[in-house]
């Protein structure tokens, strides 16, 4: 890899990290808001949650949560793919997927749902599998 490619690669990784951090802030705001921000804008009713597709596994896994956590997790895995940070980002993503859903016990107009928690975790796992399958490798493992 020549010097220009390394610089370009570093810039891309920095951009992905930036998008990951901004996405996390937005996720936390949307998750902790008492009601549905999307429902407020789309339906003019904060009590209605828009549904992208039907839920998975006979309504046991929230499709919206799977999609969101696939995207955010993939950004995290790409941005923090170095061997030293990969364990931390993986732990963080599983932690945040559980923690944010548990916070719904304490937020008015929100409620803990097992299918949402399952969707969060499935999203992280699917993203991790996709990342590990397609990740470029060096001789000694991670980049």
Residues covered by each model-derived region:
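Bulky hydrophobic segments
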Residues: 2-108, 112-115, 121, 125-143
């Amino acid at each position: 890899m020549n010097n220009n490619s390394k610089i370009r690669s570093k810039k891309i990784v920095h951009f992905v990290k930036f998008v990951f951090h901004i996405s996390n802030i937005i996720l936390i705001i949307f998750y902790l808001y008492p009601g549905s921000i999307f429902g407020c804008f789309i339906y003019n009713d904060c009590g209605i949650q828009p549904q992208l597709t039907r839920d998975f596994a006979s309504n046991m896994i929230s499709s919206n949560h799977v999609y969101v956590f696939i995207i955010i997790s993939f950004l995290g895995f790409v941005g923090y793919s170095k061997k030293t940070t990969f364990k931390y980002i993986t732990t963080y993503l599983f932690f945040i997927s559980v923690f944010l859903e548990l916070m719904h016990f304490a937020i008015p107009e929100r409620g803990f749902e097992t299918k949402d928690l399952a969707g969060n975790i499935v999203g992280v796992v699917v993203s991790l599998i996709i990342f590990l399958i397609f990740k470029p490798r060096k001789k000694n493992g991670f980049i």
